[in-house]
Amino acid sequence: MTFFELVKALILGIVEGLTEFAPVSSTGHQILVDDMWLQTKYVLNSQESANTFKIVIQLGSIFAAAWIFRHRFLEVLHIEKTKTEGPRLNLLHIFIGLIPAGIMGLLFDDFIDKHLFSVPTVLIGLALGALLMIAADLFNKKVTHTTTVDEMTYKQALIIGVAQCLALWPGFSRSGSTISAGVLLKMNHKAASDFTFIMAVPIMFAASAKSLASNIQYIHSDQILFYIVGFIAAFIFGVLSIRLFLSLINRVKLMPFAIYRLILVAVIAVLYFGFGIGKGI
């Protein structure tokens, strides 16, 4: 691996860490930064290896979220004692939230991989996700009833879990769909975000681990450093991104992210349809 090749791994790891849990679609950013610009398939000598690299850096982001919420997971699993009295988020909330997307993923995973991973379909997901986020902010200007994740009901967990199914469409964004659903259910943005990230860790880890196991043969010994650099960058910037997002989301809400998504749609559309960059993805 040359220095400039490792810089590509660093850039993609940073992009993954910054975008995986923000409601801006990490898939859209990977198309823009990798498929249209850096093109790691040429660095790693195959599209399969490039796809495997994306799985590895996504795992870096997942570990970042797991680290941020480590005490919460330990509480839910009864490994660590709860520090406060009263209602608490429990394992059943998470399980209920995971059921809809888990079932849909098992049923349609192959179809999604074959038919929905293209630039036009991702652009549709980006745009529709942005519209949902705008609607969530516009139609929920009243006082929220659920101010912390510990106050949420099982019904809210189920509806948010159903909304997570929208994220099976590439580009829609898991956090965009679930935070929007939470806000429409009268949760404040921080509470909806907390549940989104906590719920995402187990299902994303399971999906990524399954994908990595199926593609492990595409990781070659002379490319290990490339994967390590990307993973570490995704983890570090994932931690920073999640902490910053959670500290700001109640103030800035979803609208700025929705506007950013629409700008991203325009940029990718111009490059793809106007200049033919990324054709064949």
From Swiss-Prot:
It is a multi-pass membrane protein. It catalyses: di-trans,octa-cis-undecaprenyl diphosphate + H2O = di-trans,octa-cis-undecaprenyl phosphate + phosphate + H(+). It is found in: Cell membrane. The chain crosses the membrane at residues 49-69, 92-112, 116-136, 152-172, 196-216, 224-244, 257-277. It is an enzyme of class 3 (hydrolase). Bacitracin is thought to be involved in the inhibition of peptidoglycan synthesis by sequestering undecaprenyl diphosphate, thereby reducing the pool of lipid carrier available. One of its GO terms (biological process) is response to antibiotic. GO terms for molecular function: undecaprenyl-diphosphatase activity. Its EC number is 3.6.1.27. Belongs to the UppP family. GO terms for cellular component: plasma membrane. Keywords: Antibiotic resistance, Cell membrane, Cell shape, Cell wall biogenesis/degradation, Hydrolase, Membrane, Peptidoglycan synthesis, Transmembrane, Transmembrane helix. This is Undecaprenyl-diphosphatase. InterPro entries: UppP. Catalyzes the dephosphorylation of undecaprenyl diphosphate (UPP). Confers resistance to bacitracin.
